Amino acid sequence: MSVRESFNPESYELDKNFRLTRFTELKGTGCKVPQDVLQKLLESLQENHYQEDEQFLGAVMPRLGIGMDTCVIPLRHGGLSLVQTTDYIYPIVDDPYMMGRIACANVLSDLYAMGVTECDNMLMLLGVSNKLTEKERDKVMPLVIQGFKDASEEAGTSVTGGQTVINPWIVLGGVATTVCQPNEFIMPDNAVPGDVLVLTKPLGTQVAVAVHQWLDIPEKWNKIKLVVTQEDVELAYQEAMLNMARLNRTAAGLMHTFNAHAATDITGFGILGHAQNLARQQRTEVSFVIHNLPVLAKMAAVSKACGNMFGLMHGTCPETSGGLLICLPREQAARFCAEIKSPKYGEGHQAWIIGIVEKGNRTARIIDKPRIIEVAPQVATQNVNTTPGATS
């Protein structure tokens, strides 16, 4: 089967050169404030963080707040917890419908990193660029909203409200909320020495979308055309788009099946940044060591040809709606990786063992010469509808 036709601006009576990504100067989750700056900015919110919780709950219920992507707040009644997250990104692909799906998947991913599989409600946050013409706005933004809505329904939830504003750049995001019993989520702080690290989506999305834009910029394309073909770039771009739009819900469910000890999702801080943040949260004195980097095919070579300007080999390259990084018992990890590929979960799910958890000081690192796992594109075997009403 072949991939369905991608977004064509002329099909919507727009100029053939219309590009959604031109309505922002940053891409995807590359908008994040650096981690060290963020921690300093949030210090005042962390003061007396647990006092109220301890007053009425005796600190019995688990709680998670400032410093992680999801908050877990014990409710006053019934032994339940509110699990909530918010996120937003800028356009990273030019297909408005797929961009809506990616934005929704990106919001939900923080819940999935907690092992939460059911979302009770979503809000959508939308910034409509004041640089869009009325025609562009009226053609493009409904596609974005439809993509967001369809992804939320795939996740078993719905969008019941939100906020829409005029903004210089297009902004896409939302809020995901659920109420859980203690056995319905997994706190991200129980990694132990001997665990292994599993990743559920390949790295390199930022590289793929960047070099796809370089196809129209000769001075940039000429720097990399000796290491990658136009077909390679097109396949990597399609694969990146499908991976970003794929929900991490299956992986979240399997975290319970295979006794996951901790997890986070990989987004704007890159795999190393998010691994470091997760390591800091651990109750046991451990460190994470990453030996393998699964990367979209040809994107490692592109990164090296660019002088590693993307930071891909160093683990600092931002990802958008990336996979889950999961700490699993060694004896369970291989079974997790095999199970997630089962056809019963649909096409496209993958996982790799990429490192280990060892005794340490709550840090994370990538070894000097990590093994690069070239992840071949699966788009040629998938029948994916990237635009409402498109036909194969």
Curated annotation (Swiss-Prot):
Its cofactor is Mg(2+). Keywords: ATP-binding, Cell membrane, Kinase, Magnesium, Membrane, Metal-binding, Nucleotide-binding, Nucleus, Phosphoprotein, Selenium, Transferase. It is an enzyme of class 2 (transferase). It is found in: Cell membrane; Nucleus membrane. Its EC number is 2.7.9.3. The keyword Membrane applies. GO terms for molecular function: ATP binding; metal ion binding; protein heterodimerization activity; protein homodimerization activity; selenide, water dikinase activity. Its main location: membrane. The active site is at C31. This is Selenide, water dikinase 1. It comes from Danio rerio. The gene is sephs1.
